[in-house]
Swiss-Prot record:
Belongs to the peroxidase family. Classical plant (class III) peroxidase subfamily. Substrate binds at P209. The lineage of its organism: Eukaryota, Viridiplantae, Streptophyta, Embryophyta, Tracheophyta. InterPro entries: Haem_peroxidase, Haem_peroxidase_sf, Peroxidase_pln, Peroxidases_AS, Peroxidases_heam-ligand_BS, Secretory_peroxidase. Residues 1-25 form the signal peptide. Binds 2 calcium ions per subunit. Binds 1 heme b (iron(II)-protoporphyrin IX) group per subunit. It comes from Solanum lycopersicum (Tomato). It holds the Pfam family peroxidase. Keywords: Calcium, Disulfide bond, Glycoprotein, Heme, Hydrogen peroxide, Iron, Metal-binding, Oxidoreductase, Peroxidase, Secreted, Signal. One of its GO terms (cellular component) is extracellular region. Ca(2+) 2 binds at T240, D278, T280, D285. This is Suberization-associated anionic peroxidase 1. CDD domains: secretory_peroxidase. Removal of H(2)O(2), oxidation of toxic reductants, biosynthesis and degradation of lignin, suberization, auxin catabolism, response to environmental stresses such as wounding, pathogen attack and oxidative stress. These functions might be dependent on each isozyme/isoform in each plant tissue. GO terms for molecular function: heme binding; lactoperoxidase activity; metal ion binding.
Amino acid sequence: MGFRLSHLSLALSFVALALAGVAIYRNTYEAIIMKNGSLLKNVSPDFDSLESGVASILTLNNNKKRNSDKYLRQQLTPEACVFSAVRAVVDSAIDAETRMGASLIRLHFHDCFVDGCDGGILLDDINGTFTGEQNSPPNANSARGYEVIAQAKQSVINTCPNVSVSCADILAIAARDSVAKLGGQTYSVALGRSDARTANFSGAINQLPAPFDNLTVQIQKFSDKNFTLREMVALAGAHTVGFARCSTVCTSGNVNPAAQLQCNCSATLTDSDLQQLDTTPTMFDKVYYDNLNSNQGIMFSDQVLTGDATTAGFVTDYSNDVNVFLGDFAAAMIKMGDLPPSAGAQLEIRDVCSRVNPTSVASM
């Protein structure tokens, strides 16, 4: 008797689960109709029986899977389509390698700080013809994520037909999505940037902040881009995520002497040896500033931010309240993303981010 009851109970459980699935799907379906009635008003599936309800679930779910990409393309505005396409590529890249998030943020910074946000850093060198920014000392064997931007560009082309978006725009979106993916505050990214038909090798050397820069040099470089001291300290907070090459940060003159023991690098430095920039390198948090206040910032250029009363005050503000830092960082990134290309630059919307278009469109 007990055996039969247990089987009956099991059978009733399966029936209950099936009915619950039908009810949930029906409620979801009705919610979709409420939201998109004009699209679905002629669809009226029959849920009167368990058999037809379960069959409808299986059929509609299979159709939904096959048609999801097409449906999204039809429903999204052109701008939203671009954001969705880029975000999917960025999320996938960071899921595969968390470090990539910091790399994409840095790539956007290194693009904008050299002659404005013009995608110049993405241009490959051409032997004997063109030397760009990728192999300049601040970027050589260091800047990375080019392939992610290329994938995002192709995804936009495939997913959002008849939408023209620059590679500089894609860099800006990818950086924003990386910040959010790693736990930072998201922020708005306006589209409309253009891509330069050239790059500036020497500009990367002269305009980008370096790990050995003292505070005076850093202030001048940020002032040249119209950033305040507070914005400079906020943007330095990008070092709350990511790694740097040991040969860059764990060498005399670049590393903060007080943090020398934190450099987890081998005695023989190679470009493949990496040093995390704070103690939580995959989380967009305030630990970078906590480390600075404890005199444990890794890079010399970071630790000197505590050597001046004004900048040290901002470091303390951010160490005391992560939300203040996240808000200021987001605002500074928006401002940085608006840095214009050099006056007179020849501009276009590149078809492929790593090379200029075969024939230039008129200057934009």
